[in-house]
Amino acid sequence: DRLEGGKKIVQFADTMKMSTYLVAFVIGRIEASAPTSVGKTTLRLWTVPGKKHLTAFGQDIATASLQFFERYYGIPYPGDKLDLLAIPDFASGAMENLGAITFRETALLVDRRTGTHGELERVADVVAHENAHMWFGDLVTMSWWNGLWLNEAFATLMEMLAVDAWKPEWKRWDSFGVSRARALSVDGLHSTRPIEYPVRAPKDAEAMFDVLTYEKGASVLRMLEQHIGPTVFRDGVRHYLETHAYGNADTKDLWISLGKTAKQAVPDVMDGWIFQPGYPLVTAELTQRSELVLTQQRFTYLPDPAPGLWQVPVSFRIQAGEKTETRRLLLTRAEERVA
């Protein structure tokens, strides 16, 4: 509605309940792609004029990943529209504003005909990561910044699941361990930190946006998924999201939900990985009596031993003649002997 003096009133549709840090307004000369639909959700990509021809690939993965997450989480996308906006000179890689995700242009726009595989993979990963946040982070938000890993580690794991389902020929799980090598290199330092630690000042929260939160966090979640089984893990995630929808949660709440479906004490396995720094170096040795001896100690670059004990899911294969047997155990002590 236009008023006197060149003023006008703009009315916006009501939004769903959201955390204050997820509110965003994008104002400027921008153009929208043709919409696609996922259930009742209208999905569009937005760019500055002249770049709309670069939206097709991003729109494909945005649509595919949104469909994937609705199936995986068992919960429809909690809104009626989803806009993905390419912003020139955007400071961050992307930001999961609820219903209006903002991206650096290189993280959303690419020509599928001329883009390198690395460029296509980056767009797919970032778009899937941000869409995953619509549930982990947006539908359920961490209680405080010490729980940031609940947002970012889960979104990193979920991006891998979604992209692998969309483009299995990319073999993303084959490269998963390699791409997490940066976290291992940092976590071997004496100065490393736990995935979760107390946040008392803004600088503490800012320091959490690193490879330990994203890469190490996603790696230990993948380890847990493989330990309790993908279906049990997924059902625990669904319970967590359903229980805490439109609210706040912390690490303890996640363990409770996963424990209900796994029927085991998840904190016993996972707290060491989340709340203590570093990671274990597991060594296997076969004795002359055909005993397998497994030992663990914290890995460090320096020769000085560092304290630390983890519960480590271990799989090993035994071959006797033509018979092959795969066994699993949970290494809970510094040394374990298997006959």
Predicted feature residues:
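Short, intrinsically disordered, charge-balanced linker/junction segments flanking boundaries
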Residues: D1-R2, V178, A334-A339
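Extended Gly/Ser/Thr-rich low-complexity repeat segments
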Residues: T20-A34, D304-V314
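Beta-strand-rich binding/interaction modules
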Residues: V266-P267, Y279-A339
